[in-house]
Amino acid sequence: MILEDTDLPLSHEQPSYSQIKDVLDKIPTGEHLWDLPKYEEKIILNWLIKLLATNLEWITVEEERDYLVSTICERIAERSGRLAAPTRKREFSLSNGVSVVLREPTMTYNTLGFKTWGSAPLLSANLPKWEDLSNSINALELGAGTGLVGISAAIQLGWQVVCTDLPDIVENMQYNVDYNSELIQQYAGSVSCHVLDWMNPPDDDNRPSWLIKPFQRIIASDCIYETHFGELAIALFRKYLAKDGIVITEYPLRETHLEEIGVFEKGMDAAGFERQMGEEIGEEDFGSLYPVTCRWSRWKYHG
């Protein structure tokens, strides 16, 4: 059993090429793909995705890094169904009876945001339950990915939404916004797409025009899969949220990410946020192994 023989190296410890390769070599593939019991397969797949999300930036030898990235993508592709599917368009039905269409390109090692993850459709469905129709609400979405939540907020609630992510993700997000632009305008909403790197946000003296005004809502869906992501998100909330604003989060309670989620939630408490919360069942894109409990929260600042 791989988990009895090997401790999976943690990404935040920046494991070496040989450490990662040793584990990859032991992961069943080909005709032995499903030799692992379900609980081990779940842990392995989460480890692969989490490792991939780091871009393996600490592996400085390009050939070694390329090999690891390629192998990780192959292992994920074998296990992931739609995750590794070629570029296609998906249709999502909203609570007001409208359907939006999103393009999802094939995922690569640095483009996890090309897929619409399990908590995003749930959060899109929840927004009209919590919020009234108002085209005066300005909202910032962090890690917006395909743009589903931001687009749905504009169409269902008439919000003025700024969707942000990394450069490679924003290009596809903009395509999705343009594709659904007539619906967005029909419901008096708006969506703009911009690059926002959590690790390198603009200095206060050099904020772009779209970041100058505080946001009444900040949305983050399925963004807590590294400990430092939670810390960075909290810093952005405090930086860009209006005094009377609300932070809206939802994320799957994946077994391998409970520590990161715990750090994030304690950090929000320590930063002076109080919340309403609940849990519901969502579906990951990994087949029948992956129905998952998702936790939503509406955070208000009381610092």
UniProtKB/Swiss-Prot annotation:
The recorded induction information for this protein reads:
By glucose, sucrose and fructose.
Per the UniProt record, one Pfam family is Methyltransf_16
Query: What InterPro entries is this protein classified in?
Result: Methyltransf_16, SAM-dependent_MTases_sf
Q: Where in the cell is it found?
A: Cytoplasm; Nucleus
Q: Gene3D superfamilies from the xrefs?
A: Vaccinia Virus protein VP39
Enzyme Commission designation: 2.1.1.-
GO BP: any one term: methylation
State the top-level EC class. Answer: transferase
Q: Name one GO cellular component term.
A: cytosol
Q: Which residues are S-adenosyl-L-methionine-binding? A: 117, 143-145, 165, 198, 221
Q: What does this protein do?
A: S-adenosyl-L-methionine-dependent protein-lysine N-methyltransferase that methylates elongation factor 2 and elongation factor 3A.
Q: What is this protein called?
A: Protein-lysine N-methyltransferase rrg1
Species per Swiss-Prot/TrEMBL record: Schizosaccharomyces pombe (strain 972 / ATCC 24843)
